[in-house]
Amino acid sequence: SDINSLKQMDVILTCQGGDYTSEVFPKLKAEGWDGYWIDAASTLRMADDAIIVLDPVNLNVIKDGLVNGTKTFVGGNCTVSLMLMGLGSLFQNNLVEWATSMTYKAASGAGAQNMRELITGMGYLYNNTKALLDDPKSAILDIDRQIAELQRGEGFPKANFGVPLAGSLIPYIDKQLESGQSKEEWKGQVETNKILGNQQIVPIDGHCVRIGAMRCHSQAITLKLKKDVALDEIEDMIRQSSQWAKVVPNTREASMTDLTPVAVTGTLTVPVGRLRKLNMGKEYLGAFT
């Protein structure tokens, strides 16, 4: 954070987190620095003079920004970016009237210490019920009762999440807003529309939930399309969304083997499956990614 050294740079690429950005960026600007700031933190995402970078989807917006003098480029929210990596072409082809996203967010989104805490919680439950688990005559209701007592007890590791995650879930992520949304849910609409450079806002809302997966966020998406589009056409558009998008056939076997965090972690694949028209009408599309 040596401002004198940093202001000599033409380009600064930072992955130091929001506190660093909040401290350093204003000081650099106050010193008259006019270089390119490329940032993984969320701090500057919604600034008027910043572009949210998702180049497989919004390269045209990025190029226009460069031509017009934009110098602040920021990475987007995880599930917003993943939704657009998989379904971006439906938005780009102006087919989406509105969307809901119900997210199943992994521990990794909360940070390294939270990932450790999830594993520690799993171990705590196992170690304290091992005697019953090893006894084939033990009743599962007794084990279940003991698990619940352990989760509610003072000894359960929850310093980072605040409540137990292992064997449970957390139906609220980030700050509480006056709208009733969490901040994580608010990001869905504002960031999607900013990434795409939309002049007319596409309404997006949903619920963001933390689950006991280590990595790979998942989301169940409902899209209200502006017209009836055949599923095979939709699948072709998804394949064109990015080179990493993969259509998973809507079968039980394919969904269970190819559409899970276990299948995807460690890869760059963005699988999109459970694609089907919903009972509400032919313009309603369900997806899981």
Task: Give the location of each predicted region.
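N-terminal Rossmann-like NAD(P) cofactor-binding subdomain of oxidoreductases
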Residues: 1-160, 201-203, 227, 236, ...
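Contiguous C-terminal substrate-recognition/catalytic subdomains in enzyme active sites
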Residues: 130-262
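Coil-to-beta-strand transition motifs
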Residues: 216, 282-283
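Short, well-ordered beta-strand elements
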Residues: 285-289
